[in-house]
From Swiss-Prot:
Chain segments carrying region Head domain (RuvB-H): 258-334
Keywords: ATP-binding, Cytoplasm, DNA damage, DNA recombination, DNA repair, DNA-binding, Hydrolase, Nucleotide-binding
Classification of source organism: Bacteria, Pseudomonadati, Pseudomonadota, Gammaproteobacteria, Enterobacterales
Protein name, as recorded: Holliday junction branch migration complex subunit RuvB
Binding site for Mg(2+): T69
SMART domains: AAA
Organism: Pectobacterium atrosepticum (strain SCRI 1043 / ATCC BAA-672)
Length: 334
């Protein structure tokens, strides 16, 4: 319910979009992290260009803020084509999708964010477009209605989602390339923070960039947001370079701890530890205990905590690990 208000939320914020676009890499050679994805996409793109074909349809999934839109833009740039952007909830009617598809040039990219939220009627129109580059359109109404087929130019559909499991099998099976984005390591994030600091004209030391990177929850979008807040702190509270000390003071003031946890993460972990004796606890009980929706816990709070080894999923529910106890200076009673 309050995810949008969190400083370390990985969700996009409209007022940040302009700055984020300016800091995004444009080509694969500028793309940092995700080495397996980068290597595979380089081969797929080169092969498609060598054949003179459109790139196969691409599904990109993973937690928010890891660069799905950035990768889609890079693909379009590397292929030398235009990209049209929309999102699942926006495409309410079949005609909305048809209008986009009929305006594509050969090999263009159509990027659909939140593709798991497509309506069934729109999805049905998408199937023949993806498979046969054809569009089935109904003309007229009632008994006089008839279907006509329109040929489409070869194009690449790039779908992005945080919930790949919510895609229907027929849609998922039509993607020739599927890429999962993982959380970034600290070294890659530090490089990204340094590059963003250059774009913003900041004097950021190695220690300063490291402090921002290690608290950014493995997520470039969060790293860039924290960097901007550290910049604000530095402009008011200090002079000169943003050092490790300045970054630490700023992030401590913002209540983002050394693991990148904010009060919601700490609330979740302490609920498991204090209210449920470390677990296991069912998701519904945990959601009620902290006043959040189960989807928020599952999609927003848990992934990073599980990846970092602070929560363990078991058949009987969630458990706090020894890492979680140590983070709060506690000892688990056996």
């Amino acid at each position: 319910m309050i995810e949008a208000d969190r400083l370390i939320s990985a969700d996009a914020v409209p007022e940040e979009e302009f700055l984020d676009r300016a800091m995004r890499p444009k080509l694969l050679k500028e793309y940092v992290g995700q080495p397996q994805v980068r290597e595979q996409m380089e081969i797929f793109i080169q092969a498609a260009r060598k054949r003179g074909d459109a790139l196969d349809h691409l599904l990109i999934f993973g937690p928010p803020g890891l660069g799905k839109t950035t990768l889609a833009n890079i693909v379009a740039n590397e292929m030398g084509v235009n990209m049209r952007t929309t999102s699942g909830p926006v495409l309410e009617k079949a005609g909305d999708l048809a209008a986009l598809l009929t305006n594509l040039e050969p090999h263009d990219v159509l990027f659909i964010d939140e593709i798991h939220r497509l309506s069934p009627v729109v999805e049905e129109v998408l199937y023949p477009a993806m498979e046969d580059y054809q569009l089935d359109i109904m003309i007229g109404e009632g008994p006089a209605a008839r279907s006509i087929k329109l040929d489409l130019p070869p194009f690449t559909l790039i779908g992005a989602t945080t919930r790949a499991g919510s895609l229907t099998s027929p849609l998922r099976d039509r993607f020739g390339i599927v890429q999962r984005l993982e959380f970034y390591n600290v070294a890659d994030l530090q490089y990204i923070v340094g590059r963003s600091a250059q774009c913003l004209g900041l004097d950021l030391t190695q220690e300063g960039s490291l402090e921002v990177a290690r608290r950014a929850r493995g997520t470039p979008r969060i790293a860039n947001r924290l960097l901007r807040r550290v910049r604000d702190f530095s402009e008011v509270k200090s002079e000169g370079a943003i050092t490790g000390t300045v970054a630490t003071q700023a992030l401590d003031m913002l209540a983002v701890d050394t693991e990148g946890f904010d009060y919601m993460d700490r609330k979740l972990l302490l609920a498991i530890i204090d209210k449920f004796m470390g677990g296991p606890v069912g998701l519904d009980n945990l959601a009620a205990a902290i006043g959040e929706e189960r989807e928020t816990i599952e999609d927003v709070l848990e992934p990073f905590l599980i990846q970092q080894g602070f929560i363990q999923r078991t058949p009987r529910g969630r458990m706090a690990t020894q890492h979680a106890y140590r983070h709060f200076g506690l000892t688990r009673e056996e």
